[in-house]
Amino acid sequence: YPKASDTDIEKINTDMWENLGRVIGEYPHLRCLTSVYCEVENIEILQDIAKNQTPCIFIGMHQANWEVAAMRLREQPGLNVGSVYRAPNNKWSAAILQSLRDYKKGEKYFAKSKQGVREMIGHLKNNGQVGILVDQKYNEGISLATLL
């Protein structure tokens, strides 16, 4: 943000750390949050996808607790939603996050990698659904300047 003032940058940083703290604090309670605070509009679309076993890609916004929407989709009967993730660089943080996710229902997570893409394609070919966040960065390919 080259045109942002020091005050603006400080506010962005403060808000970012506050949001990250909330996200971390919510992790142990994700299952409760999905059923209480996550409302689905146009649920008939999800019901149709489930009924017809339609492969599709759900695209979400990387805002607040990004796990909630994917978990809510997985609660929809008949859907088989796998999520794309990028493991944190810190291996201990990655292990903690993985332990807080619920794998009891056979939930699928696809690593943001070439192998993960292959797994996603296979999942879609088997009439599954994939959830991805619009800002997930991949370091291969063409580099583009953004936020100029």
Enumerate the predicted regions with their spans.
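Negatively charged linear elements and acidic catalytic determinants
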Residues: 1-36
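Soluble catalytic domains of membrane acyltransferases
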Residues: 23, 31-148
